[in-house]
Amino acid sequence: MDDNWIVENLENALATWNEKLAEIWQLVSMTPQEFKGGGIWNIVVQINGALQAIGYGLLVLFFAMGLFKNTVNFQELRRPEAALRYFLHFVAAKAAVTYCMPLMLAVFDICGGVVSTVAGQMGGMAGDVGALPGEISAAIGNVGFLASIPLWLVTILGSLFITVRSFILIMTVYSRFFKLYLYTALAPVPIAAFGSSETAATGKAFLKGYVGVCLEGAVIVLSCLIFSAYMGSGSPAAPSGSAVSMVWTYVAEMIFNMLVLVGLVKGSDRIVREMMGL
């Protein structure tokens, strides 16, 4: 190993980080139909269609439960306005179950518009937010063999940490897609709860949860954009001193900044719930 290996190791770790940030932008701007060529989406559509029959059964059950609970006897149904109200309620709930797929896609498109607006107003994702400063490279190139041994340890640990954090970041974004698929596939069952006012809270909670998952993309994009702007405003300080102290300070500050971003991305669901009251 030599000094060039130390620089190359750090640059490779930062390149992996930049690559994962670019991949995040591609994922959050991608529709469920486009993800992985649409193969997963086709399965989700099939499951959604198969569960519609169960949704209709639950809809009738919930509607009957609400009807029997709210009408002591059927005298109330003799009034045209009461009968019309129950009829319209049932028709609206049935339409929600029948067209739950277009409903879910419409919600996703609206939230996707929020993501595009956020990115568009701020100029999109930055290209390379992490680049090794020239003074760090120069300091590493000037050290001798014995002095470079501590640098090997620092760069190995720092590079490993940066690489692991970059994969944690991308795994969090991938998990959002899987949550979108789960919500969409199972949609007919919880939406059938709108058949009765007593069970409608379940349907409302489901839709709120789905909106929250969709809006996670906006929080993720905004977090990455703020991180990119922060890193673009200047590299972490590289104070004068030994090469080991300079590299250690640089790596420590980079790791701290990355930890903040990873924490925001992983907590995007909690942030959305707190902001939107979901």
Where are these regions (language model features)?
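Alpha-helical transmembrane segments
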Residues: 191-208, 240, 271-275
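Short amphipathic alpha-helical coupling elements at transmembrane boundaries
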Residues: 26, 82-89, 116, 120, ...
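Loop-to-transmembrane-helix entry motif
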Residues: 47-54, 90-94, 167, 171-174, ...
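Non-cytosolic segments of integral membrane proteins
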Residues: 93-186, 224-277
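Alpha-helical membrane-interface segments at transmembrane helix boundaries
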Residues: 44-52, 84-88, 92, 141-144, ...
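Binding/recognition "hotspot" determinant
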Residues: 1-58
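Hydrophobic transmembrane alpha-helix segments characteristic of membrane transport
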Residues: 58-94, 186-200
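Alpha-helical transmembrane segments and their helix-start/interface "positive-inside/aromatic belt" motifs
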Residues: 1-10, 80-100, 203-213
